[in-house]
Amino acid sequence: QAVNAVLYGKYTMEGDQFEKIEVDFGRSTKNNITQGSGKEWSKQDRDTFDPTHDLDLYCDQASGLVNIAIMDGTVWRLLNGFKLFREKLDTRRGSNSQLETAVKDLGAVVSFKGYYGDLAIVVAKTSYIAEDGIEKRYLPEGTLVLGNTAADGIRCYGAIQDAQALSEGVVASSRYPKHWLTVGDPAREFTMTQSAPLMVLPDPDEFVVVQVK
């Protein structure tokens, strides 16, 4: 949910007991960009092209300040291939505790490359196992995500439709624990915790997602 909300401003929610539904946060179309003909980074001169103008233009589409760029390896290789980008990339700046905390346990799949002005450059290779059993990357190939490290989602909870919870006066709760006994030989005691979280992105325009070609 969270990754798709950032990438597309929406996601599909589905389960065994309800129909598939699309949760759309209403991201502006200008915040999902695909590099057009003649603008592709792969077709630019590596010695003379400066990607600064493009990056500034992309960042301007966000509703707030952008201070981090997260990309896959394909985008990083393109960017780092530009001479003018390498000359401006600061790899010696001092510590940033907030950023270090965010990536400290992800050293094998997340790499902090440095700062491009005030923009932290991070390469992510995180993956997950899809329903078909195939490992897939969270970031599709050629994806650049621009955002702010302070951006945060909200975990919302729907109503737990349990008559016992209602009879106990549970009106609003993130989780509802319950236990019950069954009569028999042997008798059994069961425990269960019910929860219905839904990830919400309050401002989907905080992020700008670029498909780099």
Give the residues covered by each predicted segment.
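Short, glycine/acidic-rich hinge or "gate" loops at secondary-structure transitions
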Residues: 4-21
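Extended, solvent-exposed, turn-rich assembly/linker loops in the middle of proteins
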Residues: 20-106
